[in-house]
A protein has these predicted regions:
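Class I SAM-dependent methyltransferase SAM/SAH-binding core
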Residues: 40-42, 46-94
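A short SAM/SAH-binding and catalytic strip from SAM-dependent methyltransferases
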Residues: 104-116
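A short glycine-rich, Lys/Arg-flanked "PGG" loop and its adjoining helix->strand segment in the class I
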Residues: 118-133
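Conserved SAM-binding loop
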Residues: 63, 87, 103-106, 136
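Conserved alpha-helix/loop element of class I SAM-dependent methyltransferases that forms part
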Residues: 18-38, 48-52
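A short acidic, Gly/Pro-enriched loop at the edge of an enzyme's catalytic core
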Residues: 93-105
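C-terminal alpha-helical "lid/dimerization" subdomain adjacent to the S-adenosyl-L-methionine
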Residues: 7, 14-21, 135-157
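N-terminal, positively charged/glycine-rich alpha-helical extensions of SAM-dependent methyltransferases
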Residues: 1-11, 23-28
Length: 157
């Protein structure tokens, strides 16, 4: 019961805080605006990328994340944008889309959390249109001690 309360009420806010740090936000702001056309975001989480999309370049956005608790926060963030968003409660190992469906796929600081990253990457390749872009940003251990502290706290997640 305590684990369920933690997962539903505390963990989403910890993830949001840790993933919203300045260094990570700067990286998001260089990667996400490149997305265009029909966009799939892998691990949309709490919607921290939503503010970085160029609404003039994005026709539709599908956000994939297995956590419904994170979807609720993403929906709140969506209100501050002009994006059309569909949230799908699935992991990236089974993307519910036809082959060659997306112009851009955005995956920021998520691949390290996917149980089977090779299958997820294979699925991303399958649904990405020929000539489409996979906009990927991952991290190793950050040089900033304050970021490292949060990375270590979230490692079990």
């Amino acid at each position: 019961m305590i684990a369920a309360l933690y997962e539903k009420h505390l963990l989403p806010h910890l993830i949001d805080f840790a993933c919203g740090m300045k260094a990570i936000t700067r990286q998001r702001s260089t990667v996400v605006p490149r997305a265009h056309g029909r966009v799939l975001e892998i691990g949309i989480g709490t919607g921290l990328n939503l503010a970085h999309y160029d609404a003039e370049k994005v026709d539709t956005l599908c956000g994939l994340d297995p956590s419904l608790a994170l979807h609720a926060i993403a929906r709140d963030r969506l209100a501050a944008t002009r994006l059309k968003l569909e949230l799908v409660p699935l992991s990236a190992e089974r993307i519910p889309a036809d082959d060659s469906s997306y112009d851009s796929i955005v995956c920021t600081f998520t691949l390290c959390t996917i149980p089977d990253p090779l299958t997820a990457l294979s699925e991303m390749r399958r649904v990405l249109k020929p000539g489409g872009e996979l906009l990927l940003s991952e991290h190793g251990l950050a040089p900033e001690p304050s970021v490292q502290k949060w990375q270590h706290r979230l490692t079990p997640v």
